[in-house]
Amino acid sequence: MPNTQRLRIAIQKSGRLSKESQQLLKSCGVKFTVNEQRLIAHADNMPIDLLRVRDDDIPGLVMDGVVDLGIIGENVLEEEQIERQTLNKPSTFIKLRELDFGSCRLSLAVPNEFDYQDVSSLSGLRIATSYPNLLRRFMAEKGISYSDCMLKGSVEVAPRAGLSDAICDLVSTGATLEANGLYETEVIYRSTACIIQSNEAQTAEKQVLINKILSRANGVIRARESKYILLHAPTETLEQIIALLPGAENPTVLPLNDDTNRVAIHAVSTEDLFWDTMEQLTALGASSILVMPIEKMMG
């Protein structure tokens, strides 16, 4: 029997979210080692068990209360929720936050020779997909009838193989579509990875641990989106220089030893500091400009 006192987190065993999910948890201070032959990894420093499962199993495990947290793509989450609602199975959860990885879109695509005008061009045609519920909802909203061809993988080859007239599949860069003689026509759903929590009541100890993981995840993501900027600036152009720093709030201004005409500026920026901005800073007399990544942030 599983130890219900330990926090159970479901993550993708393999695939596009697996590595980044593990890295996020490690960045949050969860120490664990993954054995590829085992589906459960036990944290060394916290009462946490990681369940490494298929991505389409994660929503159900969370909704059924088998695990406490899950890291999953919103596309898989939404697809499974619609399916479970249809079957009158538990389908509720708490979305704790979206994450900064796993971005993609679910799109309709057709062969290059297809004369596509709008979504009504697909009326009465056959569409191959791994996401029948999301596709069905979109087409119902548009009032378009069609037939679907359910495939678990390699959806992009369906038109060429004569299985369908069009496809509905995940797109990141569009390179796979292009390689298979297809072009994107409609985005029907935009997705990113997210952390979800079971609606089951948690013990006080587990909820404290969940809050800690969430707080640390927030700090890790803020740090990834931020840069630490240090520079020296003439006092006569100080206000202009501060105004140029993108997204900087309340920078720290410190005097320089034995130089009353210049100060040191320390700032956290939540936007990219591009080369042209650095050149403008230099033109205003700034020097020793350093832009550094931030590993962790809190508060």
Swiss-Prot record:
One of its GO terms (molecular function) is ATP phosphoribosyltransferase activity. It is an enzyme of class 2 (transferase). Its main location: cytoplasm. Pathway: Amino-acid biosynthesis; L-histidine biosynthesis; L-histidine from 5-phospho-alpha-D-ribose 1-diphosphate: step 1/9. GO terms for cellular component: cytoplasm. GO terms for biological process: L-histidine biosynthetic process. It is found in: Cytoplasm. It comes from the Bacteria. This is ATP phosphoribosyltransferase. It comes from Shewanella denitrificans (strain OS217 / ATCC BAA-1090 / DSM 15013). The gene is hisG.
